[in-house]
């Protein structure tokens, strides 16, 4: 099973690495992901505006979609925000779920890593979503960090450079 997953990850990485950057309406992507989730009954909102950005579209979609899926899986709701700056675009996926302890936040980016407790096996998944999300953010020249949400929960912060 692990060898099959490794082969799948290698294939996906090769496909995304060869993808050519293009000008993308990131705001439309975020709004579309929110609308799709809302159509399935999810409590998700989007706020903020941004100008288009040169990115690999599949990589960005994979990154943001994995983060939104995690927020909805573990918290049952999410807020996605866009913050546009001259030098970078910041995308936040904010939830008020159980959160992740500060000392475990980097570990969740390791393949197949699963937390004990509320963010765990009951929710499904195999522990690859955060790995894929960070790898995609880094391929886009950006970074993905996890922070505590004020009042409780988790905020995933994607910072993408404007080139």
Question: Residue ranges of each PLM-predicted region?
Answer:
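Short conserved segment of the HATPase_c
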Residues: 100-113
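Short alpha-helical Gxxx[C/S/T] motif in the catalytic ATP-binding
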Residues: 124, 129, 133
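Acidic ATP/Mg2+-coordinating residue in the GHKL
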Residues: 95
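Conserved polar catalytic motif of the HATPase_c/GHKL fold
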Residues: 65-66, 70
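Short beta-strand/loop element within the Bergerat-fold HATPase_c
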Residues: 77-87
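Conserved DHp (HisKA) dimerization/phosphotransfer helix of two-component histidine kinases, i.e.
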Residues: 1-40
């Amino acid at each position: 099973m692990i060898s099959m997953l490794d082969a799948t990850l290698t294939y996906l990485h090769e496909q995304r690495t060869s993808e050519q950057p293009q000008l993308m309406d990131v705001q439309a992507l975020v709004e579309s992901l929110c609308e799709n989730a809302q159509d399935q009954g999810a409590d998700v909102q989007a706020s903020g505006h941004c100008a288009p950005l040169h990115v690999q579209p599949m990589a960005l979609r994979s990154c943001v979609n994995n983060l939104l899926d995690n927020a909805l899986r573990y918290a049952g709701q999410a807020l996605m925000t866009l913050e546009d700056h001259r030098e970078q675009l910041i995308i936040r996926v904010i939830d008020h779920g159980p959160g992740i302890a500060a000392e475990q936040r980097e570990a969740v980016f390791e393949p197949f890593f699963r937390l004990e407790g509320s963010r765990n096996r009951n929710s499904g998944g195999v522990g690859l979503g955060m790995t894929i999300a960070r790898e995609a953010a880094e391929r886009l020249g950006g970074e993905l960090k996890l922070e505590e949400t004020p009042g409780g929960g988790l905020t995933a912060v994607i910072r993408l450079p404007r080139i």
